[in-house]
Amino acid sequence: VDNVLWHHKSLFVQIKDTRNDFPLSGVIGVQHWAQWGGTSTNPKIGKQPQSIKDLIRVICGSEGGGDATVSDQINVLGNHYGSYDFKLAFTQPNWQVSAYYQHFFEDKSGMIFVNNTDGLWGGQLDLPKFPWLRKVVVEYLVTRDQSGQFHFIDFDHDLHPGVGGGGDDYYNNGEYTTGASYFNRA
């Protein structure tokens, strides 16, 4: 897609005892990036919507209007990347241990946690005064759920009731096929 527009926002809140009387602290936040607008090199897709109304749709993670592709009308307008970040830490004078979870999303289903526990789970031990080991980090990446079984949008909803989902196919997008790349590099 040529002449792509980008949107980014992030907000983090840290809860911490500034007098160091209480050892627990926490961080909660959100990061959100979106590619939108531009003109696809695929003639079947063509020019993507990019009005002020479409910008508001992108900022809010809403589905596209009537001038968007069918997939963007069903899901969200544009190509979205983001995460909800959670961290809990326990601090002592000579060490700190923390656990964190980054719940990533690429579309509406991930934004509303339909992709369940997909994300990055981690733990960290900080030893600032230890002579030869300062930090130990353990992380576990889960991508198995991808919002459930694959879409059944084309099926008869009377015969197959429920909400379609699945097939998130992380970091791939039907309209923005090169993703977040510059000169075909990530």
Give the positions of each predicted feature.
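C-terminal structural cap/anchor segments
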Residues: 147-186
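Signature for the C-terminal beta-barrel architecture of outer-membrane proteins
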Residues: 1-160
